[in-house]
A protein has these predicted regions:
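Conserved, mostly hydrophobic/aromatic
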Residues: 328, 396, 661
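Solvent-exposed beta-strand/loop surfaces of large extracellular or lumenal domains
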Residues: 732-757
Length: 775
């Protein structure tokens, strides 16, 4: 890629740079070319080579330098149960019976699968990427499909994953930070993990990021020795993700350094995917290739958008403003003070609100968490624990706060309360209703919203909820509680698997928005296929990262920042201690908004809020940008590192080609990791000079080198130097905790603005932010 000087960068849009880079690397955009000879297939794309060998039944993806990215056996394993014996299992491989190419696709056919069935697998190639279409399974036998396993090594005794890349990248692989999403093949992490919506089943605890609906990988070549293994020997990266939703649960099976995406149908239990006949199994998978996995995910998202599968989130000004409002959530105080779930009461809410105001923290939105309801599913407040709940909400609004409310909409504690019965709940295979339990003592059912009567009741309930309580933000929390197909299912089996969550969202979110089109719905998923239903991404919940909440939040922001071009900002909630919160707010500044869960007395580490913590929150709040569509450039990542990987040292935010925010952490002498790629990207080098971490943001629409108003939040005392292309004079207004303000003026000399950041006022109050007015 051609190096851009500083002046060129200031006037080029990000899109034009990416386009120029693509043309430089790949030439003009042309349709992929397909070559076939003697059972060998090869497809030449703009930045990849796709290969298939009929003799080995192996598919291989290479990058433009012909380095292997990923390869594996192509034939999928289809596990079936005879219709007369639900406990029986059959999975035997077939033989390749045909391999042919058409203008834009390659189809491989297999015969004698599971005895007498036929399977066909079709790959399609276009300007958007590589598409693996649903698997066609044609069987003459009365049998139920139990599961479908892509890229499997199948023999008469077993089937195992065969897809191999040296590294796999699986965001959301664990709710905690102890399992890295960057997995080397030698780790031999033998585990099936959710790529779909998630549920409480044996295995790794997963929640944040789900549904994910994709995974990534790249490879290294050490065949000639280890020299340059991670430079010249490192391949580009792939992302493989859903382009539509399957009617089964989506998992990724990891075994002995290889993997296999697989879909669990469990028709042996539910009799809904049954032969004889021709069955469409799986889903459409889109593959993208890019220089690294961050760009490969971005390309996957962008290709879905360009193909018309998804679209950019378009908000009203009101919705965008609510999305980006700094938040305070009661949940951290609830768990610190043992006031979660049925112990949440009116005294606690009043006490917390008074403590918030006394602290000096200045959020614009007050969010009330679990359990303000009297019973799950009723969507009405507890009249015994919270008798004046609606008056409390009115008080919040009178004092200028927006209101956020948490709910797990599909829970139902007492069906009769809402005019339903146990027959309207999800059922187990034996016909009994599925009963779930939260971390407290409450048991509850899960509504079967595929039943029209239940859908109407649920729709009416959420409409009434919106009309009565008038939340500005709805904190949705539920997907992980939908039971797996192996445990329970709805009455209408057309809506099993990943489609079940989509069906529920389509009912409740549509009904809510018909009552309030500007309602902001917040959730923590990373799938692009649910973007129509969510407006704000959340990094919650960080509870399994005690002692390093900031590190885990940084990693989650790294992945969620890719939603910026699609119009979804991120809410950077704190963890459960005050000490890590300023770092989380620093990392959140570029991607959306900030929040706090922290208790105002003592947190889990025995710390309380201080003016210094509060000043950082209030200061970062002044740097937040007012738009929901943006691009992020994470700086300082080490792609292959399990710990340092998928982390950014600094962040640059681009809007309409302009650098409008830079969250800059300078290298620390003696502590700098020299392996970090582009710690100071040449596009942003020397825009800001500082020896302390600092966030510099435009307050208008122009870049920080040209805008007439800036907001600066230094994390320490220093002279901050900012390159300027416009302006001669600057007025600097320093805002301190408690309201003290000082002013200074300076000349802009030689294209540089020098701002003296004084950490404390004469009275000893900590600095919140520096307002700069340039003329």
């Amino acid at each position: 890629m051609t190096t851009l000087n500083r002046r060129t960068f200031a006037h080029l849009s990000t899109m034009s740079m990416l386009t120029a880079a693509s043309r430089k690397l790949f030439g003009s955009i042309e349709a992929p070319s397909i070559f076939s000879q003697g059972g060998e297939m090869r497809v030449q794309g703009q930045n990849y080579i796709w290969e298939y060998s009929q003799a080995e039944d192996t598919v291989r993806l290479r990058d433009s330098q012909k380095r292997i990215i990923v390869d594996g056996k192509l034939q999928p394993a289809v596990i079936v149960a005879p219709a007369h014996d639900a406990s029986g299992r059959l999975c035997t491989p077939g033989k390749v019976s045909g391999c042919h190419a058409e203008r834009d696709r390659v189809t491989i056919e297999y015969e004698k699968v599971n005895g007498g069935a036929r399977v066909s697998v079709t790959w399609r190639f276009d300007e958007h990427g590589i598409w693996l279409e649903p698997v066609m399974y044609e069987t003459p036998t009365a049998e139920d499909v139990v599961s479908l396993h892509y890229f499997s090594e199948v023999n008469e005794a077993s089937h195992q994953p065969s897809l191999h890349s040296t590294y796999l990248v699986v965001p959301g692989i664990s709710e905690g930070s102890s399992v890295s999403p960057i997995i080397r093949d030698y780790m031999h992490l033998n585990q099936s993990v959710w790529l779909g919506r998630g549920s409480f089943i044996p295995g790794l605890n997963q929640q944040w990021g789900l549904p994910l609906h994709y995974f990534c990988g790249f490879s290294i070549d050490s065949s000639a020795g280890l020299r340059n293994m991670y430079t010249k020997g490192r391949s580009e990266a792939f992302t493989c993700g859903l382009a539509d939703l399957p009617s089964g649960d989506l998992f990724l099976n990891l075994y002995q350094g290889k993997c296999s995406p697989w879909i669990d149908y469990r028709s042996d239990l539910w009799k809904h995917v049954r032969g004889p006949g021709k069955l469409s199994l799986g889903a459409t998978l889109l593959w993208s290739v890019a220089p690294d996995y961050y760009e490969a995910i971005a390309t996957y998202y962008r290709s879905l958008r360009e193909a018309g599968v998804i679209h950019v989130h378009q908000n009203s000004p009101r919705k965008t403003a609510v999305s980006l409002t700094p938040q305070f959530c009661t949940w951290g105080s609830q768990v610190d003070e043992n006031k979660e779930q049925e112990r949440l009461d009116e005294a606690f809410l009043n006490q917390t609100f008074q403590a918030l105001k006394a602290s000096g923290l200045k959020p614009g939105l007050f969010s009330i968490d679990d359990k303000w309801e009297g019973a799950y599913g009723n969507l009405e407040h507890s009249t015994t624990r919270l008798p004046h709940f609606e008056q409390f909400l009115d008080k919040l609004r009178e004092e200028g706060y927006l209101v956020g409310l948490w709910a797990a909409l599909m829970r139902c504690e007492r069906p009769a309360d809402i005019g339903l019965t146990e027959d309207n709940m999800l059922k187990r295979p034996d016909g009994t209703p599925y009963l779930a339990k939260n971390s407290g003592t409450t048991h509850y059912y899960i509504l079967d919203f595929t039943q029209p009567a239940v859908a109407k009741v649920l729709s009416d309930l959420v409409r009434k909820f919106i009309r009565r309580y008038k939340p500005d933000l709805f904190k949705f929390d539920f997907g992980y509680e939908l039971p797996a197909a192996s445990i329970a299912a709805p009455q209408d089996k057309r809506w099993t698997g990943e489609l079940l969550m989509w069906k529920g969202l389509d009912i409740v979110i549509k009904a809510m928005r018909e009552e309030n089109p500007d309602l902001v719905v917040m959730y923590y998923q990373l799938s692009p296929l649910f973007l129509d239903y969510f407006d704000l991404h959340s990094t919650d919940d960080l509870f399994l990262a005690a002692g390093e909440y900031d590190l885990e939040a940084n990693r989650r922001i790294y992945f969620s920042s890719l939603f910026g071009p699609l119009g979804i900002p991120t809410y950077g909630s704190s963890g459960y201690d005050w000490a890590s919160a300023p770092s989380i707010w620093f990392d959140s500044a570029a991607v959306g908004t900030i929040g706090s869960l922290n208790d105002f007395r003592e947190d889990e580490q025995g710390e309380a809020n201080t003016p210094e913590f509060v000043a950082k929150y209030n200061g970062i709040a002044k740097t937040l940008r007012p738009t929901n569509i943006f691009n992020i450039v994470p700086l300082g990542a080490i792609p292959e590192a399990p710990t340092f990987g998928a982390h950014a040292h600094s962040w640059a935010r681009i809007e309409d080609g302009q650098l409008v925010l830079l969250a800059f952490r300078p290298p620390v002498p003696g502590d700098e990791n020299l392996l970090a790629s582009e710690r100071i990207d040449p596009r942003f080098e020397d825009v800001v000079r500082s020896t302390v971490p600092v966030v510099v943001a435009s307050r208008g629409r122009s870049s920080i080198t040209r805008d007439g108003k800036l907001a600066i939040v230094p994390y320490g005392e220093d002279k901050i130097t900012i390159r300027r292309e416009l302006g001669e004079r600057a007025k600097m207004i320093s805002h301190y905790f408690g309201g003290t303000v000082t002013q200074d003026e300076t000349l802009i000399q030689g294209g540089w603005l020098k701002v003296n950041a004084v950490a404390r006022s004469a009275e000893g109050k900590p600095l919140e932010w520096i307002e700069v007015q340039i003329s």
